[in-house]
Design a protein with these regions (language model features):
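Conserved tyrosine-mediated DNA breakage-rejoining catalytic core shared by Y-recombinases
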Residues: 2, 58-99
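Active-site/catalytic core of tyrosine-dependent DNA strand-transfer enzymes
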Residues: 16-20, 87-148
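Short, leucine-enriched amphipathic alpha-helices that occur as contiguous helical runs
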Residues: 20, 35-39, 131, 135, ...
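Conserved helix-loop functional segments at active or binding sites
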Residues: 25-33, 62, 96, 143-147
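Short, contiguous acidic/charged loop-to-helix segments that flank catalytic cores in large enzymes
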Residues: 29-33, 72-85, 120-130, 148-155
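C-terminal catalytic core of tyrosine-transesterase DNA break-rejoin enzymes
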Residues: 43, 47, 51-54, 157-172
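Short, polar N-cap/turn motifs at the start of nucleic acid-interacting alpha helices
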Residues: 63-70, 147-149, 169-172
Length: 172
């Protein structure tokens, strides 16, 4: 098994199956609409092969092929094109958002429709603002379900990696 430097520096902040189940139960009973949306983004990132938060926030409808059940996107950090198979849970989340965001450029309402992805400074600011907002909300959820660490979008990425490794998949 080969891990990238990012996974090699793993800090242990991944969710167990039980913690993921508790998070899903919290989601089902959550009445705060924005927090519920952030949880949907967390679950989408997890089910989309641990997609980075910056790629969740910059995900556009043109990147989604519902017929092939895949996501095709040039990742922001690596500038490499990836094809990610979309699981049924990921597709379900996308269907919900498609109903809410019809006619919008971006899948999730984390950045302005006018954001220029080639403007590095604007992208940096948008990413930091969105990440801070999401992670503050997720941290509250993590506390409420008794996690021993602060829940964040990055925990979705780590959790996917741990689940995949436990199923014998390679992270290279």
């Amino acid at each position: 098994v080969s891990l990238s430097e990012e996974e090699a520096e793993f800090d242990g902040k991944s969710l167990s199956r039980e913690q993921m189940a508790a998070l899903l139960e919290y989601y089902k009973t959550c009445t705060e609409s924005r927090r519920k949306e952030f949880l949907e983004m967390f679950f989408f990132a997890f089910h989309a092969c641990g997609l980075r938060v910056v790629d969740v926030m910059t995900l556009q409808w043109k990147h989604i092929d519902f017929a092939r059940k895949e996501l095709r996107k040039i990742m922001i950090k690596t500038n490499k094109r990836h094809v990610i198979p979309l699981t049924e849970p990921a597709l379900h989340i996308l269907q919900q958002w498609r109903e809410k965001r019809e006619g919008c450029r971006y899948v999730f309402n984390l950045v302005k429709e006018t954001l220029d992805l080639d403007d590095a400074e604007a992208l940096y600011k948008a990413r930091n603002n969105a990440t801070k907002c999401i992670n503050q909300s997720l941290a509250v959820v993590g506390e409420q379900i008794g996690l021993p660490f602060s829940l964040s979008m990055h925990a979705a990425r780590h959790s996917f990696a741990v689940f995949a490794l436990n199923k014998g998949l390679s992270m290279s």
